[in-house]
Amino acid sequence: MKRIYIAGPMTGLPELNFPAFHAAAQMLRADGHTVVNPAELSNSTDQPWEYYMRLSLKAMLDCDTIYLLENWQASKGAFIEFNLAQNLGFHIVFAS
């Protein structure tokens, strides 16, 4: 069983793209994986971007796999997460 971090675009999207994050988390959990979903890490949305990135990166470090949502390349945060995952030897999975 893998511990999977979900990465993808949020900023500027309707509902911060939470529906896509939740759908991916549901699918991955149904397959038996432990999932870290950044959309579930905080109940607030009033902090600066850097606050949420720090929170997400801390949670990501406990994972061994990153699951990249569609259009992840358009997200500054997801690009940072992808590069970190690559450098730490994570298994990388792209949403299809």
State the predicted function of each range:
Residues 1-96:
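Conserved catalytic or regulatory cores that recognize and/or transform ribose-phosphate-containing ligands
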